[in-house]
């Protein structure tokens, strides 16, 4: 059911935490709805996880709570999993080519191109004027004297600010605080361990035997990245059958195994398939935790086994809505358009243009959790949208709430295509495709937005 869309009635003072892609589009949408916005960014630049740095944390596993935190988890060779046409916000196409050809022309561009796109976005919509750089949010809580207000404490080079806001939108990302595999015997295993958060270049493991834990797209991508400089790479996957043992095509030194059974003091790693290797390094490509160390909700919002909840539609905690919201929690999605639609919804709700259900109705989210449990789906997969159509059903629901056009069919079909290519041609999918007709449809749409994609380039690209 689509709610009634009303004229905006309220202008709020809103704090946005984080100047990555989610925070940037949230700031734009909030201001479009007439809100006053302050974006808090602890770094000195925009981009969040897309701002590459060669620096790594001193603790290679990123376990030490006192460590200096490096926000980005990018490695040097990383290219986008999703084609550039899909990546962009719906009204600001992802342009990777200037007239002089000075930018990355690949359909799956490198991470620096994504950061360049976000900088273009900031420039086009004058977002930088809303950002407080080098300002870390250290505490967010309801203002005691007025629970409908929010107290935000922030730190800038030792100076503490204490301010009151009408609403807080949390956009701090979830690719900074690593998750780790639990490995029997690891306390006495003599080799090195590293989380992929601290992986940058293959030379870090040159001439070594490496065991990579995790067979997700990023785990396999990193394994291929290091295979040319290592002696051997062994991928451990918990999603394969116990007897799994196979050499991956295109490499003489890259194997896929089932899960690790145990590791031993002599440096050996024993897999459930019975194979044993002597490894120098174990690399954890095991994902990340949702982490909000600044947020105090008196237990209304918790993170339990990587479930942030309870949240209505992954965004609003029923007991604290609409003053507190989260953008960007779902994963295995096309992120930027989803961030945009979530932000439109939050901005419209805060403006009074769109209404939320009652708290009781929103608490039906608990039934959703019970259904997951009944289906034996672990809590850590609450925000996973791995089923091919689930994210588009969700995106279209968000669009309907705001009376905004649904996600384009070409974008949806393009995502399906790339997903199939990943499964059938994992080593070549970024440079070999069969959906030129969808690219043409995308460029036809891009003509509507000439500010970021000159029409001369559009015509040349989809007709060449």
From Swiss-Prot:
Catalyzes the conversion of methylthioalkyl glucosinolates of any chain length into methylsulfinylalkyl glucosinolates. NADP(+) binds at residues 214-219. Gene3D superfamilies: FAD/NAD(P)-binding domain. Its EC number is 1.8.-.-. Its cofactor is FAD. Belongs to the FMO family. Keywords: FAD, Flavoprotein, Monooxygenase, NADP, Oxidoreductase. SUPFAM superfamilies: FAD/NAD(P)-binding domain. GO terms for biological process: stomatal closure. It holds the Pfam family FMO-like. One of its GO terms (molecular function) is flavin adenine dinucleotide binding. FAD binds at residues 18-23. It comes from the Eukaryota. This is Flavin-containing monooxygenase FMO GS-OX-like 7. The keyword Transmembrane helix does not apply. InterPro entries: FAD/NAD-bd_sf, Flavin_mOase, Flavin_mOase-like, FMO-like.
């Amino acid at each position: 059911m689509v709610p009634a869309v009303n004229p905006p009635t309220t202008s709020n003072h809103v704090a946005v935490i984080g100047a990555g892609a989610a925070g940037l589009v949230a700031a734009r949408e909030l201001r479009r709805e007439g809100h006053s916005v302050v974006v808090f960014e602890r770094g000195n630049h925009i981009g969040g996880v897309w701002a590459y740095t060669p620096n790594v944390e001193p603790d290679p596993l990123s376990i030490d709570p006192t460590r200096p935190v490096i926000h980005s988890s990018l490695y040097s060779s990383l290219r986008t999993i999703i084609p550039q046409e899909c990546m962009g916000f719906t009204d600001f196409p992802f342009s990777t080519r200037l007239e002089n050809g000075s930018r990355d022309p690949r359909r799956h561009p490198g991470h620096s191109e994504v950061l360049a796109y976000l900088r273009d976005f900031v420039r086009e919509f004058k977002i930088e004027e809303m950002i407080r750089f080098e300002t870390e949010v250290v505490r967010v809580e309801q203002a005691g004297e007025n629970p409908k207000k929010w107290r935000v404490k922030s730190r800038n080079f030792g100076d503490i600010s204490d301010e009151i806001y009408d609403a807080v939108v949390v956009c701090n990302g979830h690719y900074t605080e690593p998750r780790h595999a639990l490995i029997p015997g690891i306390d006495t295993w003599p080799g090195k361990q590293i989380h992929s958060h601290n992986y940058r270049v293959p030379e870090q493991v040159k001439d070594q035997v490496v065991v990579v834990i995790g067979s997700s797209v990023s785990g396999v991508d990193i394994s291929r990245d290091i295979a040319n400089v290592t002696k051997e790479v062994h991928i451990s996957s918990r999603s394969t059958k116990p007897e799994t043992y196979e050499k991956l095509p295109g490499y003489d030194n890259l194997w896929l195994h089932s899960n690790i059974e145990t590791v031993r003091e002599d440096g050996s790693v024993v897999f459930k398939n019975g194979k044993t290797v002597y490894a120098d390094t174990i690399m954890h490509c095991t994902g990340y935790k949702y982490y909000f160390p600044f947020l105090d909700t008196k237990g209304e919002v918790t993170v339990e086994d990587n479930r942030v909840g309870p949240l209505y539609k992954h965004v609003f905690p029923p007991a604290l809505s609409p003053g507190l919201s989260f953008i960007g929690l779902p994963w295995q999605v096309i992120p930027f358009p989803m961030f945009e639609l979530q932000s439109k919804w939050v901005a419209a709700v805060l403006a009074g243009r769109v209404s939320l259900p009652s708290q009781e109705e929103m608490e039906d989210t608990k039934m959703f959790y019970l259904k997951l449990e009944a289906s034996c789906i672990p809590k850590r997969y609450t925000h996973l949208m791995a089923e091919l159509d689930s994210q588009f059903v969700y995106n279209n629901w968000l669009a309907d709430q705001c009376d905004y056009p649904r996600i384009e069919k070409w974008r949806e079909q393009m995502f399906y295509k790339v997903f199939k290519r990943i499964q059938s041609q994992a080593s070549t999918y970024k440079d070999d495709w069969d959906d030129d007709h969808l690219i043409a449809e995308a460029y036809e749409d891009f003509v509507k937005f000439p500010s970021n994609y000159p029409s001369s380039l559009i015509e040349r690209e989809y007709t060449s």
